[in-house]
Amino acid sequence: MSKAQRMRIKLKSFDYKLLEQSAKKIVETAKNTGAEVSGPVPLPTDREVITIIRAPHKYKDSREQFEIKTHKRLIDIIKPTQKTVDALMRVELPAGVDIEIKLKEV
């Protein structure tokens, strides 16, 4: 008897609009192949703040801050079939979205 599998997909992007579009594409593709989908679940946004001094020599009180936000989503596909895996491999995602896929036995 084989154990059931679960596919966990993590998406990361600096642009939340691209991230939402990609998550929607993945969910639609998985549902069209007959798999159960849980998500997309929004994960906490990472915020990195970088502070630099504006002047090249002195004036340490004059500073400027920049921030980079990394938005994340989690999608679980329960009991994926071979058809689901093949369809997900063919999905084209934008260049600004990082995807991490893990298969896990439940």
From Swiss-Prot:
Indicate whether GTP-binding appears among the record's keywords. no
Q: Which organism is it from?
A: Caldicellulosiruptor bescii (strain ATCC BAA-1888 / DSM 6725 / KCTC 15123 / Z-1320) (Anaerocellum thermophilum)
Q: Mind telling me which PROSITE patterns this protein's record contains?
A: RIBOSOMAL_S10
**SUPFAM superfamilies in the record:** Ribosomal protein S10
Q: Which GO terms describe its molecular function?
A: structural constituent of ribosome; tRNA binding
- Short name of any one Pfam family annotated for the protein: Ribosomal_S10
A single Gene Ontology biological process assigned to it is:
translation
The UniProt entry, under InterPro entries, shows: Ribosomal_uS10 (IPR001848), Ribosomal_uS10_CS (IPR018268), Ribosomal_uS10_dom (IPR027486), Ribosomal_uS10_dom_sf (IPR036838)
Role according to the record: Involved in the binding of tRNA to the ribosomes.
Q: Which cysteines are joined by disulfide bonds?
A: none
| Descriptive protein name | Small ribosomal subunit protein uS10
Alphabetized, the UniProt keywords read: Ribonucleoprotein, Ribosomal protein
